[in-house]
Amino acid sequence: MHFGHAAWMRQQGKWRELMVVSFKRLAKRLACATALAGLAMTTMAAAADIKIGIVAPMTGQLASEGQDMENAVKMAIDAVNAKGGVNGDKITPTTADDACDPQQAVTAGSKLVSEGVTAIVGGYCSGAVLPTLKIYGDAGIPFVIIGANSTKLVAANQGNAFLANSTGDMQATTAVELFKKNGYKKIAVVDEGDAYSSDLAKLTAEAFKSAGGEIAAKETTTAGEQDYSAVVTKIKSSGADAVFWTAYHAGGALLTKQLRQAGFQGGIVLGDGNNSPEYLEIAGSAGEGVYLLSPPTVDLLSGAADFKAKYKETYGRDAGAYAALSHDVGGLIADAITRAKSADQKAIIEALKASDFKGLAGEIKFTDKNTLQTSNFRPVIAKGGKWVAE
């Protein structure tokens, strides 16, 4: 009896130990389940926000333009969120730096895709945007391009991308109209060999020849070049009435200075990539009287005064050339999501195709090729260190 009782007591002790261990395990599992439930609720709340990617050059020579694009898009998103967001959801922006470099653009684009963005806006340099079209197209992500406008983008579009800026052929038409108005019969065309500037140079040369003009010289330089003396010599000896520079402001300003220093008296016309205060600073007095084919900037838009003032107040700097259009695109993507009545990307793409959006820069309607229906380019001239309408 005594031996049996002792064994029984030992068995009871083991059971108690097992029960304690079991309760501890159960408590841990309950704690984990509670934590996972909380995480799931947090994830669901985060998922309710609509993530919009902004891709722009945040570093490099064109970082100022990229910063303007990001700032203006965020201003538009803030305004939408202040009114309750879209379909009850807030928009959360996330920015990727493409540095206007094709390789970095691919990295930036892949990053946005991996983050699960609903849509993407931005794109300043055509050469950087071009290799990302397949990435966004394969992922089925709506992409509204703000600045880049090479016709090569139209050919590579998989149907999900939309060009909110007028295309290169529209700019070429505006350029030829200006050449004819100013009586230029022979022009020299200079580009940097990238997708944007080479496309604009080619389209303009073809359009000018079709209009009866002559291409006196066609030169290609390298981005970052400092000495344009060889190009200047060729331009002067060609007998050109005017020079059309189709690349960006850094090279355009140096070429302008060196042309004037060499005694070139003809006209100088710049593509839209030169609409920057930095061009005027670098070119100095040599820039006086130079023409620019400008996108719709805040200084040229009668209804943009409030936006211009708020931008300056918010960021402590003047709104750049593409700030108005960037702000419009921020509003446009919110409008498309609202009309799609969901964050479904196919529905958003269809909503973008049917856009009739009125923004600061004018009306945004797309053709069946997802390009802007009407040209937004206008010639301006440098006077007193500023770009002014004629």
Regions found by a protein language model. Name each.
Residues A201-L293:
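Extracellular/periplasmic bilobed ligand-binding domains
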Residues L112-Y124, V144-I146, A188-D191, G239-H249, ...:
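Periplasmic-binding protein-like
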Residues T256-H327, A382, K386-A389:
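Extracellular/periplasmic periplasmic-binding protein-like sensory domains
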Residues E313-A323, A334-A389:
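Segments of small-molecule ligand-sensing domains
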